[in-house]
């Protein structure tokens, strides 16, 4: 047994990090390297399902699983701790409760909400980010409904939910809300007509980048289910009372709301920025082999990274799909770095994108085919199950998968 | 058919009011009188189960049923409205959306929390009173737990629950909390040891009036399940930060808590007071036939009334048990008033009192026998089912009853 085995440290047990770890043991033998995975919690959560946990349509426990259940515990050290800093020069990771030395580092810390400096959003708006924020938002909405009937003077702002952003996350969350609000009305004896769901989007269209036919379908479905859209309208400020929004060159409007949700953007994890990597909004533009430029022993993947599409000369949008595929490449390349061989270039294989509209509806493109309604919703669940399958195999898929197809 | 049938109006569909209405049709024929029942909601709720709904151990929908399902709709007019005032001189009831003229009036509006003028309790403490307050308290507690892990600086006051009052309601609520807190800890990833449940009671003992052996049993059980008791200690003030409490002649103590529950007393409904009846804390000391002194056409029952125990020369404590028994007497006496006959005197038949300590434990006295543990818990459920049976018969009991005996 080698005494000085190289140390591989993987930060984050998200889609990218966990995929790396589960594949790594194929390419790196027990005598080749020590493997350590660091994650804040002892569980992995499905970031792509957080709109459901946030609305309360899917319990958060259905959206997470124990990390120890999917890693090879005899090969991988799991450290439950919070990464505080990465010291590149000292090859060291500072944790809340200790430090780790590495020879090879994989960064998969994911994203954090981006508020673009809009006043008050950080303080008063709810992000859709992880298990903690999802439980908070779900409970906050429930408390607003629960409070409504206990007050002598009725407050419509308790029943007004503003969603900032009509991109992927915003639309998926609105889809869940449209299903959840009638349930909340029943649970708390509130008339549905008193509840307002307002989506505010600065861009001139909903779901930018999506096929216009699918966009129309989604907007129509959501409007039919009580969502009001304010398109081409920017959130200018968030306060404890609500939001100020406005169209260009028009008088701003105040919307009173106790529940402002910010779903209009994410950026890379600040720790990556603070570590000194060159970055754009916290994302490091990685080399084709997924290493950070100038750092031959550091791989960065998923939402912490930025990968260019050679054809369009624009970066790929950060998705779980890409993060997982990158995990496979990182695992392979770590094997080659340690045991020799040429590093592989990452080649994304975009199978499609489907945005859910509640449990039974969706829009998207899969293998180049436009889908909407039941077929799209079916595919969405197949995709959701696929992440489980790729990381945890059939057992995990059966345990946590979505099988209520129709 | 008589053109000028007398009008009977019953206010409140609680234990007393609903019992009156369901029995009244036995003593008063369709040609004898018009019967109108007024209640704020279209449902009756089990006030005696509100500690469960408030803690979240029993869903509030399990604690209520539709009024129309238990009244004879061909005989009883049901008006869903809020009573705003009673004008005795004009024989008129003012509702939020109208007025009702009566010849005979039955008042069963129940109780409201009594804060004894303690500063801040009205504003910042949670009562355990009805479906609305229960949902609010349940959701408030959940939100505190949900928030805890989302804050960088951990706030113990989110996990500190103070219950003011170790009487019947306080102890029953503590019993539910003891069961609920471990569930909340699991749901929100909070360590049980971080949660504090503190009971503050000004009187020198827990459950005043109960047998000391049963009191010891209850205190021991609750302490074992993590409840801290501060006995002989008064709540002096409630603020948004928590409570100030103190023993006589000692330095007061500040307890930081986001959840202060006030379970230390109720008083009669203010509408009864405002109507001009002579009263003590909103309760009218009624004649033996349950009429208000000086008002031959007005019956008052349940928590709105005060009925003297001739033996002890003290009033009976207000209970659902008595309210229901009074309903039977009121129905009979209304029949006699209208059709002739001497009015009956109300004779309470106290079968016992059982305080639950969560779902599987309780203490109490039934037919003079002391009970604790499983037998007491069994009897508690029998009593809970009995109210359903008396008002709605077997059908309602099977639908809403508590049958998980062990
Ligand atoms: C509501 C929503 C819906 C989405 N839908 C889709 C979709 O349908 N399809 C799709 O492909 N993509 C979707 N995305 C995008 C997708 O979720 C992300 O691109 C993906 O999660 C990125 O994976 P990752 O491995 O980089 O990070 P993540 O999967 O987010 O994981 C990051 C991990 O790092 C951990 N971590 C963070 N900070 C620290 C720290 N300081 N110390 C220790 N551990 C830390 C976290 O706990 C987490 O486990 C969606 C996103 C959202 C929010
Ligand atoms: C947590 C708890 C546990 C208890 N446990 C027990 C127990 O184990 N055994 C026991 O015997 N007693 C118990 N009690 C006491 C018991 O609940 C009361 O004594 C009983 O509810 C009194 O019945 P009531 O008919 O007077 O009023 P309630 O049953 O309280 O009904 C009053 C009704 O009036 C309606 N109302 C109020 N205001 C208006 C308005 N302005 N307009 C129209 N309608 C209105 C309400 O909606 C309600 O339907 C408990 C009380 C609590 C809070």
Curated annotation (Swiss-Prot), chains A, B:
Q: What EC designation does it have?
A: 1.6.-.-
- Does the record's keyword annotation contain Iron? no
GO BP terms, alphabetized: aerobic electron transport chain
Instruction: Please indicate which superkingdom the organism of origin belongs to.
Output: Bacteria
Pfam families from the UniProt entry: Pyr_redox_2
What are the entry keywords? FAD, Flavoprotein, Oxidoreductase
What are the required cofactors? FAD
Checking Gene3D superfamilies in the record gives: 3.50.50.100
Q: Name one GO molecular function term.
A: NAD(P)H dehydrogenase (quinone) activity
* InterPro entries from the UniProt entry: FAD/NAD-bd_sf, FAD/NAD-binding_dom, NADH-Q_oxidoreductase
**What note does UniProt attach to the cofactor annotation?**
Binds 1 FAD per subunit.
Record bears the keyword Membrane: no
Coiled-coil-forming residues are none
* Stored PANTHER family: 64 KDA MITOCHONDRIAL NADH DEHYDROGENASE (EUROFUNG), APOPTOSIS-INDUCING FACTOR 1
The family classification in the record reads:
Belongs to the NADH dehydrogenase family.
**What's the name of the protein?**
NADH dehydrogenase-like protein YumB
């Amino acid at each position: 047994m080698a005494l000085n085995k190289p140390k591989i440290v993987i930060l984050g047990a998200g889609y990218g990090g966990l995929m790396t770890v589960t594949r790594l043991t194929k390419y790196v033998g027990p005598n080749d390297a020590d493997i350590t995975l660091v994650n804040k919690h002892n569980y992995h959560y499905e970031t792509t399902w957080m709109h459901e946990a946030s609305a309360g349509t899917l319990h958060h426990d259905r959206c997470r699983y124990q990390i120890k259940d999917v890693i090879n515990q005899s090969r991988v050290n799991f450290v439950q701790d919070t990464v505080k800093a990465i010291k590149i020069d000292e090859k060291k990771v500072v944790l809340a409760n200790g430090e780790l030395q590495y020879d090879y580092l994989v960064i998969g810390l994911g994203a954090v909400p981006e508020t673009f400096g809009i006043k008050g959003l950080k303080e008063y708006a709810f992000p859709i980010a992880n298990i903690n924020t999802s439980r908070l938002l779900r409970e906050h909405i429930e408390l607003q409904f629960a409070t409504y009937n206990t007050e002598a003077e009725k407050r419509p702002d308790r029943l007004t939910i503003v969603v900032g952003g009509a991109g992927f996350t915003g639309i998926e969350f609105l889809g869940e809300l449209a299903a959840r609000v009638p349930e909340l009305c029943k649970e708390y004896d509130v008339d549905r007509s008193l509840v307002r769901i307002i989506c505010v989007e600065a861009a001139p269209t909903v779901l930018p980048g999506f096929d216009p036919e699918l966009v129309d379908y989604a907007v129509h479905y959501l409007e039919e289910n009580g969502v009001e859209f304010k398109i081409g309208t920017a959130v200018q400020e968030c306060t404890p009372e609500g939001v100020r929004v406005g169209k260009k060159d028009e008088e701003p409007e105040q919307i009173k709301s106790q529940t402002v949700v910010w779903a209009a953007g994410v950026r890379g994890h600040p720790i990556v920025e603070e570590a000194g990597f060159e970055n754009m909004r916290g994302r490091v533009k990685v080399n084709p082999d997924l290493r950070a430029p100038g750092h031959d022993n550091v791989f960065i993947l998923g939402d912490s990274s930025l990968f260019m599409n050679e054809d369009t000369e624009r970066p790929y949008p950060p998705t779980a799909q890409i993060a997982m595929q990158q995990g496979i490449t990182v695992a392979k390349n770590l094997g080659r770095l340690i045991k020799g061989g040429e590093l592989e270039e990452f080649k994304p294989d975009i199978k499609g994108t489907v945005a859910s509209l509640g449990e039974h509806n969706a829009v998207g493109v899969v293998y180049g085919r436009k889908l909407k309604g039941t077929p799209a919703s079916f595919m969405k669940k197949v995709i959701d199950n696929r992440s489980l399958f790729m990381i945890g195999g059939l057992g995990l898929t059966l345990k946590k998968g979505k099988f209520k197809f129709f």
